[in-house]
């Protein structure tokens, strides 16, 4: 057994990343291996572990483990509204997601700690002629913890296939904001790029955190959607209609915050302005879900930022810092 194989076997999330998609019906016809480099080979089996812990005056990135192509910058404290908040930017040394990639991420926020995790830019899923790419994301937020996971959009290129599975284990007193933005593709690059991908499969689930080394507790909710635009048009009313960007935000937080947040987030539909958004409750009183549609990423990101701002203000009593010009 190679050192890479040994490391994969010893890391449950990496094992899941390599297995994810093998038995997925939506990927049944994409099990062929790439001619260049086999799936999950060295450089194609990325792993990132981030563990945040509370110290006297602030939280810190206490542990970081990575395997190429995944890496992160050091924790920075650029949020002037929350100077105790470590902000970490995830980076891919390959610059994109390629066919045969198997990626896994573990983020742990210990009791009383806080963290903000983002990406340096949009994530591109490149064109594929064999196999697919898979991603496992595990988030654990312990008692009184606070996590913001706010990556930039994901852009699936023509003929790409991508499957992602996200699990959030959260203590009843903790808060987690999980965001994702999906684009229709590189619609200005080529006529066949808009909804030109083969498969985009996403599953997000949450469980009650029972403690370290303990199995996951009660399942709070599961959301899964499989997009196959070449089989069924996404331009239908009730799906994407004329929109090109989809934003999905999961807010898991104690019940006492829900009503105040919802009162400040009315449904918004402006077909001329190219934006639609709204929020509702998740099952088991575990939190809220916010969704937005737009003609471009800027509009959707603005809607998400407003929801994020309201959530922060109602939960923590602090707002967001001024938006960076380059973001």
From Swiss-Prot:
Main localization is: cytoplasm
Q: Which GO terms describe its cellular component?
A: cytoplasm
* Gene Ontology molecular function: nickel cation binding
Compartments, as annotated in UniProt: Cytoplasm
**Which UniProt keywords are given for this protein, alphabetically ordered?**
Chaperone, Cytoplasm, Nickel insertion
Q: Which InterPro entries match?
A: UreD
Q: HAMAP family recorded for this chain?
A: UreD
Please report which protein family the annotation says this sequence is part of. Answer: Belongs to the UreD family.
Q: What does this protein do?
A: Required for maturation of urease via the functional incorporation of the urease nickel metallocenter.
Please give the PANTHER family that the UniProt record associates with this protein: UREASE ACCESSORY PROTEIN D
Q: What assembly does the database describe for this protein?
A: UreD, UreF and UreG form a complex that acts as a GTP-hydrolysis-dependent molecular chaperone, activating the urease apoprotein by helping to assemble the nickel containing metallocenter of UreC. The UreE protein probably delivers the nickel.
**What name does UniProt use for this protein?**
Urease accessory protein UreD
Protein's organism: Yersinia enterocolitica serotype O:8 / biotype 1B (strain NCTC 13174 / 8081)
Gene name of the record: ureD
């Amino acid at each position: 057994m190679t050192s890479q194989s040994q490391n994969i076997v010893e890391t449950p999330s990496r094992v899941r990343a390599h297995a994810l998609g093998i038995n997925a019906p939506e990927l049944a016809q994409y099990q062929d291996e790439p001619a260049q480099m086999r799936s999950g080979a060295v450089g194609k089996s990325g792993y990132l572990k981030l563990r945040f812990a509370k110290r006297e005056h602030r939280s810190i990135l206490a542990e970081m483990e990575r395997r190429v192509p995944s890496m992160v910058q050091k924790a920075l404290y650029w949020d002037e509204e929350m100077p105790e908040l470590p902000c970490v930017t995830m980076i891919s040394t390959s610059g994109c997601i390629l066919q045969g990639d198997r990626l896994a991420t573990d983020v742990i926020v210990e009791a009383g700690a806080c963290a903000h995790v983002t990406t340096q830019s949009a994530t591109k899923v490149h064109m594929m002629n064999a196999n697919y790419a898979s991603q496992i994301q595990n988030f654990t937020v312990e008692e009184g913890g606070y996590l913001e996971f706010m990556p930039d959009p994901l852009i699936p290129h023509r003929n790409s296939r991508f499957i992602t599975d996200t699990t959030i284990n959260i203590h009843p007193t903790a808060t987690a904001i999980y965001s994702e933005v999906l684009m229709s593709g590189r619609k200005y690059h080529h006529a066949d790029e808009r909804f030109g991908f083969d498969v985009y499969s996403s599953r997000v689930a949450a469980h009650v955190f029972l403690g370290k080394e303990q199995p996951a507790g009660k399942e709070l909710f599961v959301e899964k959607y499989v997009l196959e635009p070449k089989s069924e048009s996404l331009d239908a009313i009730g799906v994407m209609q004329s929109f090109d960007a989809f934003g999905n935000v999961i807010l898991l937080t104690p019940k006492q915050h829900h009503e105040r947040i919802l009162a400040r987030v009315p449904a918004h539909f402006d077909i001329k302005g190219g934006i639609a958004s709204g929020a509702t409750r998740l099952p088991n009183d575990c939190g809220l879900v916010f969704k937005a549609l737009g003609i471009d990423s800027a509009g959707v990101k603005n809607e998400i930022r407003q929801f994020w701002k309201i959530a922060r203000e109602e939960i923590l009593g602090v707002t967001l810092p001024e938006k960076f010009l380059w973001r």
